[in-house]
Amino acid sequence: MIRKAFVMQVNPDAHEEYQRRHNPIWPELEAVLKSHGAHNYAIYLDKARNLLFATIEIESEERWNAVASTDVCQRWWKYMIDVMPANADNSPVSSELQEVFYLP
């Protein structure tokens, strides 16, 4: 299993809306994530800095990257662009984090 972590941003006035949209996520999005080998996906909100910290375990980089090309992911990104900064393809602006410590 590959552990990943990344940081995204949320608009300052959209904390509650971001949480509402994720509680729960669309069932079809959950199904796509699971079918592409995603496990233990969690997102944490730093309200003071408007940051989202995400962790996930994936089975392979290829399967994880393939999620982006699915119809449901494309629709989700479009749904979220009013609550967080997005790239030109509507994907969330994000930065992958380097793991520096892990205690199994």
Swiss-Prot record:
Major site of localization recorded for this protein: cytoplasm
Binding-site residues, substrate: 18, 41, 76-77
Keyword Oxidoreductase: no
Pfam families: rhaM
Active-site residues, as the UniProt record annotates them: 22
Transmembrane intervals: none
The reaction(s) this protein catalyses: alpha-L-rhamnose = beta-L-rhamnose
An annotated GO cellular component: cytoplasm
Function, in words: Involved in the anomeric conversion of L-rhamnose.
Name this protein carries in UniProt: L-rhamnose mutarotase
Annotated organism of origin: Escherichia coli O127:H6 (strain E2348/69 / EPEC)
